[in-house]
Amino acid sequence: MGRTRTKKTKQVKPTTAPSSTSSAPEPSIEALFDKAQELLIQCNYDLAHRFVQRILERDSTNAEAREMSAVIDLERGEVENARQIFLSLVPPSSTAPNPPPHSAYLYLAQLSDGPHEALGHYKAAVDLVVNRVNTGATMSEDDKSELKKTAAKALVAMIEIWMSDLCMEPEAESQCDSLLALAHSTDAGNAEVLQAEASIRMSQSRPEDAQRSVSAAWTTWRDLPPGDPKIPDGETRLQLAKLMLELGLNADALEIIAGVVSEDDQDVEAWYLEGWCLWGMAERVKAGEKLEGGNDEKGKEKQEASDDDLGWEELARDARDCLETCKMLHIGQEHADKPMLVHVEELLAQLDTLGIKPSSEQGDENDGEEWVDDEDDVEMS
């Protein structure tokens, strides 16, 4: 009988309680804020809120954290909670910092129940921003530029209120003109301000002045390379394209819309405007009209090429392709703008009446045709 092997027991090292000096340090408020901001960008609102709450547990007066908490509430649909937090950040609240954040006023303007209340909040924001620019001796030029853009955007929002909700007020026109002058002096050459100017001039039945403003707005970013931060966002560019369509500058509008589509091919409104623009061009070419391409040399050259290259049927077919894409995306995304879908279907019905088929169907028909070789054709003749 062999020797039995003794079982070896594994030695277990005694555990000692970690000393207080080896525990991980508490993250700084700045680190917590950066993490909350990162989560907010990722749309992880619940986790972002937890990080903000950790900041407020350590510093309940932290204005940035309170504002971010309100922004998170907005994203989660808790609008009234957000409103109350924003109100706590501005006078006459006893918990408002000095000076209050201009961004809180901008949010309150968008959450306002009436136009006059919104105007008051926008004005407060503009006053704060302009004061910061004028007194910020040590502020960098980039920071000043961003603040000027913020003030100009708020002034444009005020102009839009006077042109829509308060358009029947006797002082509406004078208010628009004074706000426009202030916007120009605050941020000269701002594209959105120039677009607002074009809208005002159109409402005043001054189309030539409106066209000059539209051209000036486009000039501010037209030749910039794609992705340049100075190029306005897609929504602003589509607003400019709409103004161009109202002025009959379809070719220029088409160039702007195509740029937006190339950046975001899921943008329902961009496809709608591109289809509508092309359909308008098709109608005018069919009627024997020359299309307007702007007053500069680029516009004239581009328009001459467009007139030579495309007949009305080709333009109409391109319009149909865009409108079909718009309809598909509108339904797929459950887009909120129902009148847009109604108009798209009306335009498609008109194209049906004219016998304009989508490019895919037209291509299928061409594939079924019998091709005749040029040499055979010559021999037969």
Functional labels for PLM-detected ranges:
Residues 27-54, 75, 156-168, 246:
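Alpha-helical segment of the N-proximal tetratricopeptide repeat
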